Structures are given as C-alpha cells and as structure tokens.
Amino acid sequence: MVRNLFVGRLLVAGSLVWAGSALAADVTLLNVSYDPTRELYVEFNKAFSAAYRKETGKSIEIKQSHGGSGSQARSVIDGLQADVVTLALAYDIDAIANKGFLKKDWQKTLPQNSSPYTSTIVFLVRKGNPKGIKDWDDLVKSGVQVITPNPKTSGGARWNYLAAWGYGLKKYGSEDKARKFVADIYKNVPVLDTGARGSTVTFVERGVGDVLLAWENEAFLAVKEFGKDKFEIVAPPLSILAEPPVAVVDSVSDKKGTRAAAEAYLKYWYTKEGQEIAARNFYRPRDAAVGEKYADSFAKVELFTIDDVFGGWTKAQKEHFAEGGVFDQIYKN
C-alpha cells in the first residue's frame, strides 16, 4: 500500500496543490516547492502545525504546490499566491525577488544563506548495477542510457548538469574538455522530463534507462519504496553541494496578513525537530548534532560548491542555462 501511494504521487503531472486538513483553519499558507519534496513536507507540515497550535493556540493549514523549480518560480511571478517558496536553488528565488515580490537580500534572512538542509547528486541504478556504473566517466560509455530532467525547467537537472561539469573540469583540466564531457553525457539521454519526479517515474516505473541522476533524497526514497531488490544507490566520489533555499514571499504574506506565520514556518526548519525531519527524509541536516546522529545514512562524498567552480548561480545560469547558453548549444548538437 505504501508503494502504491508513492506511485500515485509519482504519476501526478505538473504542479499539485493539496490541503493538510479539510477543516477551516485560522491561518492558511501556500508553500510553492520543487519536485521531490512532497514526502518531506507531509511530515514537516504535520509537525509544524502541531507546534504552531501549541505556541499560538491557532490552527494552521499548509497547502503545497510542487513541480520543476524553474517552472514553480515562473508560476509565482505569474501570480501564484505563495506565502513561502522552498525551491531547488537560489537563482529561482532570485528571479522572484528581481520582480519585486521579496527583498533582494532574502538569503540573509535565515542562517546558512536560508538553506536549512543540503543534498547532493547521486546515481540510482538497477539491482546488481548491470552496466557497472561507479563514476561520472561511466555515463559517457556506449550503450548506457542516462535519465535526467530538463535543466531549462528543473532545478535538480541544473544541479545534475553542474555536478557533471565540475567533475569533467577537475578530471580533464579545461572548460572545453568539460564541455565535451557533458555533451557526451547528454548524447546518452533519451528523454528530458520537466522535473525530477518525472524522471524518477521514467526510470523507476517505465523502466527506461540504466542510471538516474538524482537528488540523494529521491534516490533513497525510490529504494525505500520499491526495495533494495530492485534498485541501488551509487554515490560518485565527487559531486556538488546542493543547497535548496527557502524564503517568505513578502508581497503575498504582507497582503494576506500571514507574515508572522510564514516566518515561523521557515524558522521551524532550524529547530531540532525540523533538522530531524530533514535527516529522516534523506536530506543532509545543517545541525552538527543531528548530522552526527545520521552520519551513517549518507555516503562520504567530496563536495564542491557552485561558488567555487562556477562563480555563483547568477553566472552559472547566464552562461549555461539562459537562451542560447552552453546547454542549448550542446543539446542541439
């Protein structure tokens, strides 16, 4: 039954919104999030709602919207009334801020640049790893099909792309060689889904591909739900430190009078319980004590940052993912 519920969530296309309770609440928030956080926020919202009622005496309902991070950001810009956004990468929230919906220094509002947990990119392979995939180099081999979403719509896909580029740059020593390496990976990609969850469906349910480039939490969730007899996780020795951020949407929360609740909601991530929830859902917690408790859950991977290798998200977005950027050039060819 658990598996069927997971599959049901997997097969929902596009942005999904649901309420935590059928009863009218004193406060209602809309959290616009990225694709593979659905299960995470089921647990987080339940815990926060209980804590909020205990603290304030008021009931709160959290509605969720999920989809590719870039698409979700555009939905907020186009009028989706998000009280908070919890997206895959800072650039997508910057895009919302640049339209005046929240202050441009929003990352200074909460600790760790408003990223309460981290993740990385790993490989999900079929049981027994029949293609012997162990590192990024294996993704360019003839006969290996790689599943990854479209970086024009998916934040996870951009992390996948940049992780591969960072590996290529370190191993081969030049931007030109890194470009060729990443281009060769995309020659092995048969389909680009719009979001990370869609790519999981393609790989897990439809049986397409030999390896899924995945958020670490998404890979763990697939193994948990479908079994170690079906899939296994390969953590490459080198990958990227992914820092999914969170922010209150000032214009919406002020208009709706929900700012206090929205701020409390995001601050709850930094409590012991919030960090425990992140870790239980296979995200790497920021809190050192919680991180130590769950240390054995996560592979030891050398992680590089987007700032160190790419000069930050603004530069990476412009160079690689803007119209006519490097991704467009290599994917066309």
Name what the model sees in each region.
Residues K171-P237:
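Ligand-binding pocket segment of bilobal, Venus flytrap-like solute-binding proteins
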Residues I121-N129, E243-A260, I277-N281:
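A bilobed periplasmic-binding-protein/Venus flytrap-type ligand-binding module shared by bacterial periplasmic
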Residues M1-L11:
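Bacterial N-terminal signal peptides that target proteins for export
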Residues A25-S154, Y331:
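N-terminal segment of the mature folded domain
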Residues W18-A24:
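Sec/Tat signal peptide C-region and signal peptidase I cleavage site
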Residues G128-K134, T153, G166-S174, V252-A260:
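Short helix-loop capping/hinge motifs at secondary-structure junctions, enriched
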Residues V32-Y34, V125-K127, Q145-K171, I185-V189, ...:
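Short beta-strand->loop
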Residues S253-N333:
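Extracellular/periplasmic juxtamembrane helices and adjacent flexible linkers that interface
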